[in-house]
Amino acid sequence: MTPWFLYLIRTADNKLYTGITTDVERRYQQHQSGKGAKALRGKGELTLAFSAPVGDRSLALRAEYRVKQLTKRQKERLVAEGTGFAELLSSLQTPKIKSD
């Protein structure tokens, strides 16, 4: 099984874009060449700010959703220190118990 990664790209105007992929370098190059997400087209210089393996596609999608819900300050902390990423992944991997 191919591992999935969560990544954050910083735009020229200091915004952070969150995405998932199986190949961070390939996806970053797609964004750089304008063939990636429309949200990044015309945003100037892009830099890869953060990437981390997250496991399978399902977990990657949940992690992406959760990171997109974070505030800019929380995302900046994640980029700078990786703070909270392990806990975030752990919370996503914990099975939820359904009550009847």
UniProtKB/Swiss-Prot annotation:
Matches recorded under InterPro entries: GIY-YIG_endonuc, GIY-YIG_endonuc_sf, UPF0213_domain, UPF0213_GIY-YIG_endonuc
GIY-YIG domain mapped to chain residues: 2-77
Alphabetized PROSITE patterns for the sequence: GIY_YIG
Lineage top rank: taxon: Bacteria
Pfam family, one: GIY-YIG
PANTHER family attached to this UniProt entry: UPF0213 PROTEIN YHBQ (PTHR34477:SF1)
Membership in a protein family: Belongs to the UPF0213 family.
Protein name as catalogued: UPF0213 protein YhbQ
